[in-house]
Each structure stands twice: as structure tokens, then as C-alpha cells.
A protein has these predicted regions:
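N-terminal Sec signal peptide cleavage junction
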Residues: 20-23
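Serine-dependent carboxylesterase/thioesterase catalytic core
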Residues: 89-179
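C-terminal catalytic-base region of ester-bond hydrolases, centering on the histidine
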Residues: 160-250
């Protein structure tokens, strides 16, 4: 299986993608080389969601983080990990010779996050970066769905996981574990509840049936402000070199 191809789908993943709809739009344009000391943040959306869908949590978080100096943030569809790799390499390639050398590798910290199938793509992407000897400061999985989305590769410094475990069919991957505990620290796994307030009060009106059928908890998590507030803190901490979660009570 190539990194671009979806793996054999489990029932859980199949329901996640069932009748997803929505045509893919052209992806982001290539970035300029970013300044040294920057934080490059890559987000992956779930299902068949468009890379630029402003109503999805992954994209909303990216647009919020873009307002902060020193953070360079872009989002991609979960099927476009190779496109995201090209984006990162272009951002690091200061001399524009088409290669990322050892000095350029250290120009920026890299943070990767994703929701649903985007959580699966987060680890697929981290493994691609490992193949290029590119370190990852943080991987953040949000209600991750997919195959082989629990093993965090050893080029990742910190890993975090936000999930719900009450969905009728879809429950986020947990626990995650480092391939090499000497190199990767799982800073935390946080479970969110949707069988009582405030979780079960989150409105999912207006979503198509395939986004809510047997997966209401999964849909609510994407709209849960607690989730994205936590995600924002974790990303900011990692970009600033702090242990993610250290800036606020867990």
C-alpha cells in the first residue's frame, strides 16, 4: 500500500466515508521558504472533506493559528499526504535547489494534526517525514479513524490524542503508543463525553445524513469548542518548545 492510497477499510472507516460526497478542489499553492525559527503546522481533514472547508474543525483551527506570528499553517485532504510533503519540503528549501539539506531541516519545527481519517493521515505523514529525516515536534490526533493509526513513529518528539469512545460505530483510536519510547513521549490522551451535557447539547443540525447516521458523537466532536480549544493550546505549546499541555491545566 502506498501512502497516497486508502488502506483496506474497516466497517468503522467505511461508515465514516459512506456517501461522503463533495468534490476535491485544487490544493494549496506552493509556499515561499519560511524564515528560520518558524513553526510549520500541517492539518489533515477527515472523510472526503475539502482541504479548505471553513466549517470543519481542522480548517477553523488553521485559520485561527494563522493569525499568530511565526506560525505557518496549511490544511490538506487526508488523501493528499504526498502533496503535503511537497508543501513542507518547499517551505524548508531556502536555496530553492529542490532538496532539503541538513541545515534546512532545522529551519522550522513541524507540527501535524488531523481529525477522523485526518488523524490516520497524521501518522502516515509523520512516517513520510521520517523517511526524509525530518523530525516532527508534535502529532495530534483528534478522534482518529483508520488503519495502523496507533503507532507513533520515532521521529516524533511529542504525541497527543483527543478522542470519544461512545459512538455507536465510530470511536476514536486509543490508546496510541510510541514505536520508540526513548524518542517519543505521549503527553496525554483526553477523552470527551457526548452522552451528557455539555457534549450531548452540541448541535449537529444541517449536516447531511451520512455525517450523523450512527456517528453523532463523532460529528459532535468536530463541533466541540472544548476539543479545538485544547488542540490550539497543544499546538501553540509545541511550537513554542514547551511540553504540550504545560501551559494550562489538563
Amino acid at each position: 500500500m502506498t501512502a497516497e492510497a486508502l488502506p483496506g477499510l474497516t466497517l468503522m472507516t467505511a461508515v465514516a466515508c459512506l456517501a461522503c460526497g463533495g468534490a476535491s478542489r485544487p490544493g494549496p499553492t506552493g509556499p515561499p521558504a519560511i524564515p528560520p525559527g518558524s513553526c510549520l503546522v500541517v492539518g489533515f481533514l477527515g472523510g472526503n472533506d475539502r482541504w479548505d472547508d471553513p466549517f470543519k474543525g481542522v480548517r477553523r483551527l488553521a485559520l485561527e493559528l494563522r493569525r499568530e506570528p511565526g506560525l505557518y499553517v496549511e490544511t490538506f485532504e487526508n488523501r493528499r499526504v504526498r502533496r503535503a510533503l511537497g508543501f513542507v519540503e518547499a517551505a524548508l528549501d531556502a536555496d530553492r535547489n529542490g532538496e532539503v539539506d541538513r541545515e534546512e531541516t532545522g529551519r522550522a519545527s513541524i507540527v501535524v494534526y488531523g481529525q477522523s481519517l485526518g488523524g490516520w493521515a497524521t501518522l502516515v505523514f509523520a512516517r513520510l517525514l521520517a523517511g526524509r529525516d525530518l523530525p516532527v515536534q508534535l502529532t495530534l490526533q483528534i478522534d482518529s479513524v483508520g488503519w495502523d493509526d496507533a503507532d507513533v513513529p520515532p521521529n516524533v518528539r511529542w504525541a497527543a490524542n483527543l478522542y470519544q469512545d461512545e459512538g455507536a460505530v465510530i470511536a476514536g483510536e486509543h490508546p496510541i503508543k510510541p514505536s520508540d519510547p526513548r524518542r517519543t513521549t505521549v503527553v496525554g490522551e483526553w477523552e470527551f463525553d457526548y452522552d451528557r451535557p455539555p457534549g450531548n447539547e452540541i448541535a449537529i443540525d444541517g449536516l447531511p445524513w451520512h455525517k450523523t447516521f450512527l456517528r453523532a458523537d463523532h460529528a459532535r466532536m468536530d463541533r466541540d469548542p472544548r476539543v479545538w480549544s485544547k488542540a490550539a493550546r497543544l499546538v501553540r505549546d509545541a511550537c513554542e518548545g514547551r511540553v504540550p499541555g504545560a501551559s494550562a491545566a489538563r
